[in-house]
């Protein structure tokens, strides 16, 4: 289960977010993006000491400041059910496809099948293609 798929499923559900500086935010998840930046609504912010509280209608939290997220167990169960329903876990699709990696034979990535010299002779850097029967410089 990937963290971002968990967050996408948790939209419109309550969650607790603790930041690296010790502050906590309790609210309902509105949205999240690929960098785990999140928007919360109906937020209660608690100071790191736990002695001050603020109520906010909405709040934006940068993903890189998050220490951890506490999400209800029912959300985790929903994500597990989605993974089973899709029938894919780690490597599910890759095992069905033909894999072309190291040691699997085939031509690989290069056109001529290897490294170094051994391509078409006479086509070096900036040199015209050599044609038999003509000398360079004489017309």
UniProtKB/Swiss-Prot annotation:
One of its GO terms (biological process) is P-body assembly. One of its GO terms (cellular component) is P-body. Keywords: Acetylation, Isopeptide bond, mRNA processing, mRNA splicing, Nucleus, Ribonucleoprotein, RNA-binding, Spliceosome, Ubl conjugation. There is a cross-link at residue 80 (Glycyl lysine isopeptide (Lys-Gly) (interchain with G-Cter in SUMO2)). GO terms for molecular function: PH domain binding; RNA binding; U6 snRNA binding. InterPro entries: Lsm4 (IPR034101), LSm4/Sm_D1/D3 (IPR027141), LSM_dom_sf (IPR010920), Sm (IPR047575), Sm_dom_euk/arc (IPR001163). Its main location: nucleus. Signal peptide: none annotated. Residues 87-139 are annotated as: Disordered. Coiled coil: none annotated. It holds the Pfam family LSM. Residues 2-75 form the Sm domain. Disulfide bonds: none annotated. The modification N-acetylmethionine is found at residue 1. It is found in: Nucleus. Belongs to the snRNP Sm proteins family. Component of the precatalytic spliceosome (spliceosome B complex). Component of the U4/U6-U5 tri-snRNP complex, a building block of the precatalytic spliceosome (spliceosome B complex). The U4/U6-U5 tri-snRNP complex is composed of the U4, U6 and U5 snRNAs and at least PRPF3, PRPF4, PRPF6, PRPF8, PRPF31, SNRNP200, TXNL4A, SNRNP40, SNRPB, SNRPD1, SNRPD2, SNRPD3, SNRPE, SNRPF, SNRPG, DDX23, CD2BP2, PPIH, SNU13, EFTUD2, SART1 and USP39, plus LSM2, LSM3, LSM4, LSM5, LSM6, LSM7 and LSM8. Plays a role in pre-mRNA splicing as component of the U4/U6-U5 tri-snRNP complex that is involved in spliceosome assembly, and as component of the precatalytic spliceosome (spliceosome B complex). The heptameric LSM2-8 complex binds specifically to the 3'-terminal U-tract of U6 snRNA. This is U6 snRNA-associated Sm-like protein LSm4. It comes from Homo sapiens. The gene is LSM4.
């Amino acid at each position: 289960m990937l963290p971002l798929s968990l967050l996408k499923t948790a939209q419109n559900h309550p969650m607790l977010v603790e930041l690296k500086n010790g502050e906590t935010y309790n609210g309902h998840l509105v949205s999240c993006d690929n960098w785990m930046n999140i928007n919360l609504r109906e937020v209660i912010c608690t100071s790191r000491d736990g002695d001050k509280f603020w109520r906010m209608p909405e709040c934006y939290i940068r993903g890189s400041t998050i220490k951890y997220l506490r999400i209800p167990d029912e959300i985790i169960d929903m994500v597990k059910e989605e993974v089973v329903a899709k029938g894919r876990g780690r490597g599910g699709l890759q095992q069905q496809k033909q894999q072309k990696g190291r040691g699997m034979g085939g031509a690989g990535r290069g056109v001529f099948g290897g490294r170094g010299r051994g391509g078409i002779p006479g086509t070096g850097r900036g040199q015209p293609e050599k044609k038999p029967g003509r000398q360079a410089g004489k017309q």
